[in-house]
């Protein structure tokens, strides 16, 4: 099975969520189930049914996170030395040659992507066009809205 690239930051966020689910959410829902059981007939007990449903969601999410972490290739961006090239984990400042707009993106794993925070998926059209390029290069992006060209202004590994 292929490993999925993930930054150390992304892995840490998943570990924090996993810890919260195991130490806070799971015990809380187990307590809610026990409390609802005490109310009697389980067939018509909405509290019990809701708590069991929540438990199923929590257990499913725990398994999902554990699988993601087990299948992750965690990459420490600060230790990269790709010689100025855009690679997974790099932060690239790019200029749209048509509009002159300058934006900064970090290329991250699919689960870490958050466009509003400047993190784009390694599988996105922009990231695919940028990877392997370096400062001064022009990347051509085939996007749903048409072809766009971006000049790479700077590349950082933070």
UniProtKB/Swiss-Prot annotation:
One of its GO terms (biological process) is DNA-templated transcription elongation. The keyword Glycoprotein does not apply. Transmembrane segments: none annotated. It comes from the Bacteria. It holds the Pfam family GreA_GreB_N. Residues 49-73 form a coiled coil. One of its GO terms (molecular function) is DNA binding. InterPro entries: GreA/GreB_C_sf, TF_GreA/GreB_CS, Tscrpt_elong_fac_GreA, Tscrpt_elong_fac_GreA/B, Tscrpt_elong_fac_GreA/B_C, Tscrpt_elong_fac_GreA/B_fam, Tscrpt_elong_fac_GreA/B_N, Tscrpt_elong_fac_GreA/B_N_sf. Keywords: Coiled coil, DNA-binding, Transcription, Transcription regulation. The keyword Coiled coil applies. Disulfide bonds: none annotated. Necessary for efficient RNA polymerase transcription elongation past template-encoded arresting sites. The arresting sites in DNA have the property of trapping a certain fraction of elongating RNA polymerases that pass through, resulting in locked ternary complexes. Cleavage of the nascent transcript by cleavage factors such as GreA or GreB allows the resumption of elongation from the new 3'terminus. GreA releases sequences of 2 to 3 nucleotides. Belongs to the GreA/GreB family. This is Transcription elongation factor GreA. It comes from Methylococcus capsulatus (strain ATCC 33009 / NCIMB 11132 / Bath). The gene is greA.
């Amino acid at each position: 099975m292929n490993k999925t690239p993930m930054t150390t930051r992304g892995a840490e966020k998943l570990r924090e969520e996993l810890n919260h689910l195991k130490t806070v959410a799971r015990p809380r829902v187990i307590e809610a189930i026990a409390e609802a059981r005490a109310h009697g007939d389980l067939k018509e007990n909405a509290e019990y049914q809701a708590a069991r449903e929540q438990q199923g969601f929590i257990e499913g999410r725990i398994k999902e996170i554990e699988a993601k972490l087990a299948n992750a290739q965690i990459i420490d961006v600060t230790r990269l030395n790709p010689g100025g090239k855009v690679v997974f984990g790099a932060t690239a400042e790019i200029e749209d040659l048509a509009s002159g707009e300058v934006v900064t993106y970090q290329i991250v794993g699919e689960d870490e992507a958050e466009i509003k925070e400047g993190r784009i998926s390694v599988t996105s059209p922009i990231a695919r066009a940028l990877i392997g390029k370096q400062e001064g290069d022009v990347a051509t992006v085939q996007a749903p809205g048409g072809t766009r060209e971006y000049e790479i202004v700077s590349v950082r590994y933070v």
